[in-house]
Design a protein with these regions (language model features):
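Motif-centric detector for short Cys/His coordination patterns
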Residues: 1-134
Length: 134
């Protein structure tokens, strides 16, 4: 696939039909402004030689990103992407984690080991328990 020719939305996904005829998708959680946009705002996009652009929303999606192997956010990514009120660095400091490393996990630049992922999920649950104790 060299370019996406048409797009459509379904739930929290953006789909694209490539010039090879195949359908591709990726999560809108990576593009919060696009996820929160109205149907009318989503319909006002431009397709260029390298990607799709929504000028009013200031959102760009490259064609290449439809080929990334991890279209679905991990559990950690999903949590922080859907709970913007929780600051990643603040969470890391509270629980003695490296803020830069946690941001790398959330942004997909690094992947935690299974053990580290379970530890972070446990800490997320601990934070939830603290909130319910109020």
């Amino acid at each position: 696939m060299n370019r996406i020719e048409t797009i459509w939305f379904n739930g929290e996904w953006i789909y694209g039909r490539g010039d090879d005829g195949a359908a591709y998708r990726q999560s809108l959680l990576w593009y919060r402004r696009l996820m929160d946009a109205s149907d009318a705002e989503r319909a006002r996009y431009e397709i260029s030689t390298i990607g799709i652009h929504w000028p009013e929303l200031d959102v760009d999606i490259s064609f290449e990103s439809f080929l990334y192997p991890e279209a679905e956010p991990s559990r950690i990514q999903r949590f922080f992407l859907t709970h913007e009120e929780i600051n990643v660095s603040g969470f890391a400091r509270k629980f003695g984690l490296n803020p830069s490393l946690l941001r790398s996990y959330v942004n997909g630049f690094k992947t935690p080991s299974k053990r580290k992922e379970e530890e972070i999920i446990r800490l997320i649950h601990k934070l939830g328990e603290e909130y319910t104790g109020v």
